[in-house]
């Protein structure tokens, strides 16, 4: 191997062709693979644990090794039958974009270092702003995912509303809000007593009346309500809070409204999603994850801020060793001054290139398809004996559970549904996950992969139905 860490031009081509062939083979034959191929951790440890090599190895053989022992020992979140958590149905154009971004080693942190890349990011952010109804004056940037996007937005909210003085400040959100919000608030220094969880209604949306009452009570106690976090598509069941009502309340109370649309926000492209997400454009800040419902490879999240300059006012620092990168030219931007990351990937490229290659109409159709699949599952369960739909299909998520007619014990029913989900994964024909809603263990299905067909979904549900009957046989009849 070369001491200057280079391969010859021919070696680079051959290695690149080999990598591309592996990826295309994976994508074209994904449906023939089990959804999850993970094996015992001891076996993996024995195969992959070693000392750092003193000398190099043949890169072609190393790619074969990785394909056998790493890429075939994972859960394929891009598999059309992966219906657990939030699937990651990426697209090949996004993969190529990531390859190009790494190959050219783009540094989209300062205009002086990556002007073309920064303009692509500005353009793509503008597309998302327009899509979500944010004003032209709004700003944003791409980050690693929803967790970093929520942290970025809440850091801006702390600066804008509290000038970083968090004493007696209170933030409000529902019991269905993603845990990344709790983590972000912990990082930002908020204590447990400064976090107020508001009850949800029968549709698992935040109770606006309870929120209004709590804010009023907190003000009388000398506390400082400063932020309400709305759900624009919960991870649990796809519920969307009453965004217009929350915007009205926050406007009246001079409170920052942050909308977590990490999962659900892209659904605004669809007619049904747009109806559910009415008012999302009124949020002071918004997060969304293109690596979820915009079908991008990991990782890429996004944060939008309604008022311009808030990002740079919150994060900008200018030590002497980067003053050469400073710019005051209109239209130029240094994204490294707009968030937590200074070193950052050219994440915008895959979103930009995917929109350019496929067009927004294709994304709209793909999102509509995911919403329809969940509705198809709900309809199937509605006709099936011994099945309960716990939350109806909304934004591509439906939750349900199996209740054998002869069983009445809640604990037993919970255990059966847990075992059923484990057995589905073990059989390899699909993968679903469980969650807890209304004090019940439920099965959760998320159907956003555009390459899952209606026929496949019906076959999966038929197999799950038969497997549920098989699993329940091992449980004794229990009367309440």
Swiss-Prot record:
Kindly, how does the activity depend on pH for this protein? Shows a working pH range between 6.0 and 8.0.
- Lyase among the record's keywords? yes
UniProt xrefs under InterPro entries: Aromatic_deC, PyrdxlP-dep_de-COase, PyrdxlP-dep_Trfase, PyrdxlP-dep_Trfase_major, PyrdxlP-dep_Trfase_small
A Pfam family of this chain: Pyridoxal_deC
Required cofactor(s): pyridoxal 5'-phosphate
Return the broad EC class. lyase
Per UniProt, the keywords (alphabetical) are:
Decarboxylase, Lyase, Pyridoxal phosphate
Point out residues bearing the modification N6-(pyridoxal phosphate)lysine. Answer: 292
User: Which applications in biotech or industry are described for the protein in this UniProt record?
Assistant: The broad substrate specificity of AADC-BA could be exploited to produce various aromatic biogenic amines.
Catalysed reaction, written as an equation: L-tryptophan + H(+) = tryptamine + CO2; L-phenylalanine + H(+) = 2-phenylethylamine + CO2; 5-hydroxy-L-tryptophan + H(+) = serotonin + CO2; L-dopa + H(+) = dopamine + CO2
Q: Which family does it belong to?
A: Belongs to the group II decarboxylase family.
The name this protein carries in UniProt is Aromatic-L-amino-acid decarboxylase
Tell me what organism the protein belongs to: Bacillus atrophaeus
């Amino acid at each position: 191997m070369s001491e200057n860490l280079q391969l010859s031009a021919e070696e680079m081509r051959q290695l690149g062709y080999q990598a591309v062939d592996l990826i295309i083979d994976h994508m074209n034959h994904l449906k023939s693979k089990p959804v999850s191929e993970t094996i015992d951790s001891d076996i993996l440890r024995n195969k992959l644990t070693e000392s750092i090599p003193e000398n190099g190895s043949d890169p072609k053989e190393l790619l074969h090794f990785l394909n056998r022992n790493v890429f075939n020992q994972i859960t394929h979140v891009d598999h059309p039958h992966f219906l657990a958590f939030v699937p990651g149905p990426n697209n090949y154009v996004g993969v190529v974009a990531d390859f190009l971004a790494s190959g050219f080693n783009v540094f989209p942190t300062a205009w002086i270092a990556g002007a073309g890349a920064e303009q692509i990011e500005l353009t793509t952010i503008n597309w998302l702003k327009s899509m979500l109804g944010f004003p032209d004056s709004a700003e944003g940037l791409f980050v690693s995912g929803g967790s970093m996007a929520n942290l970025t937005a809440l850091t801006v909210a702390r600066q804008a509303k509290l000038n970083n003085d968090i004493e007696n400040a209170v933030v409000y959100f529902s019991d269905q809000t993603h845990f990344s919000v709790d983590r972000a608030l912990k990082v930002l220094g908020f204590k447990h007593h400064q976090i107020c969880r508001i009850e949800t209604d029968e549709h698992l949306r935040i109770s606006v009346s309870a929120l209004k009452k709590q804010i009023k009570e907190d003000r009388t106690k000398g506390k400082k309500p400063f932020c309400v976090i709305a759900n624009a598509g919960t991870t649990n069941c796809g519920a969307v809070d009453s965004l217009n009502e929350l915007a009205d309340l926050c406007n009246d109370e001079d409170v920052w409204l942050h909308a977590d649309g990490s999962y659900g926000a892209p659904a605004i492209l669809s007619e049904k999603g747009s109806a559910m997400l009415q008012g999302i454009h009124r949020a002071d800040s918004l997060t969304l994850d293109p690596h979820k419902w915009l079908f991008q490879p990991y990782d890429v999240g996004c944060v939008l801020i309604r008022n311009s300059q808030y990002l740079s006012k919150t994060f900008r620092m200018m030590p002497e060793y980067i003053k050469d990168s400073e710019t005051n030219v209109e239209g130029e931007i240094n994204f490294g001054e707009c968030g937590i990351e200074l070193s950052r990937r050219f994440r915008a490229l895959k979103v930009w290139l995917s929109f350019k290659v496929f067009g927004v109409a294709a994304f709209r159709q793909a999102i509509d398809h995911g919403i329809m699949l969940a509705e198809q599952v709900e309809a199937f369960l509605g006709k099936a004996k011994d099945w309960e739909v716990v939350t109806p299909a909304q934004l591509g998520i439906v939750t349900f559970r199996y209740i054998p007619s002869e069983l009445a014990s809640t604990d037993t029913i919970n255990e059966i549904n847990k075992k059923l989900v484990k057995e589905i994964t073990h059989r390899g024909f699909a993968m679903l996950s469980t969650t807890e809603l209304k004090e019940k263990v439920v099965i959760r299905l998320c159907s956003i992969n555009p390459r899952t067909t209606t026929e496949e979904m019906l076959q999966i549900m038929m197999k799950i139905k038969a497997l549920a009957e098989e699993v329940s046989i091992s449980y004794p009849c229990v009367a309440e």
